[in-house]
Amino acid sequence: MRCGRKPGWRRVFRCPLDTAKAVYRSPGLVKGVSYRPSRRTRIVFQARRMTAAQRQSLLPAAEGKTAAVSDLTEKERAEVLETAYQYVQYLYVAEDIELAEYRRRSFALLSARSRLQVPAGAKEEKPVGRTPFAAHESMRVSVGAGSRNGNAFQEFAFRPAYHSLEDDDFGLLPGAEINFLNLRLRRYDRTDKTVLNRLDVLGIRSLSPADELFSPLSFTVSLALAREEDPATGREGYVLNGSVGAGKTVAAADNLYFYALAGVAGGYGGFLPRNQYAAIELTAGLFAGFDRLKLLAEAKKSFSSSSFAERIRYRAEAGMPLAKNWSLAAEYFFDDNAGKDNDEEFSVSVRYYF
């Protein structure tokens, strides 16, 4: 079966969502689409609808302490006990509790629920989600302009896959990004020279909010070849940078996250002192994912074995979706290079997804 209408060269970069879209768009292959929220999605949705008193009693109830719901109305007790039972099921399937403990908690919850006179009505599930088949296309090309340390430039960028935090996340998982082979070419006015500015071989970021019920790990992984300037000597050259980090994210609202990460980084380049560096990185930032505006702002402190990477980087990125496959973007960063010449860059671009 030949799925989709992409030319041959584009099939090299096809991601799983592209294949799913191709099947969905092929006449006669798909009769309908059903949305099934996961158990975790249902639990989170139900917990967010509860009153403060209900939420306070939810965890004790899930531990089998059913007396925690005694001050609630019967309807509120029923909602807490049913959600707590789903949570206990989740913990058991995730192998966070043993079978004996699962049975003890389940028996306590179901016994308490059976004593209530409230009928078991249809549970209110999370509303139908935004279908990924309506998400933006995975490939992206952009043209833009900006300035680095007073030197104006024009930029062309191409990313085969897949999604950035500042892209429109309609139909996709908020707070998650995967960038693969993101290529940036620049022409600087001062030197009238076109250079490879950066090649992001792989960039993965997951900002998954933690709460009283779930505590997922937020993380970042990156590998990139970048043209950089040594602030101590002013020399430019290419550096292969890699980093991994992990931490926690909290949600101040459905579309506003705060996060903190700690990680390690390293780089190799012929023009660097001793050709390499290693660093420990601490990062704090926020991500706002409104429908018509995506904003990422963070500060990263690097403790490095080389003066080259000893810095505090302040970075901000913004994206404004214009249509399904069009957006405007702006990027800014400022490097405080520990007493050496600082770096500052700003750029704006138009992006097209295809």
Where are these regions (language model features)?
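Structured, non-membrane catalytic/scaffold regions adjacent to prosthetic-group chemistry
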Residues: M1-Y35
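Outer-membrane beta-barrel "beta-signal"
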Residues: F158, M320, N342-F354
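Repeated loop/turn-to-beta-strand initiation elements of outer-membrane beta-barrel proteins
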Residues: S164-G171, I178, S206-P216, V250-F258, ...
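Outer-membrane beta-barrel initiation region
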Residues: V30, S34-L173
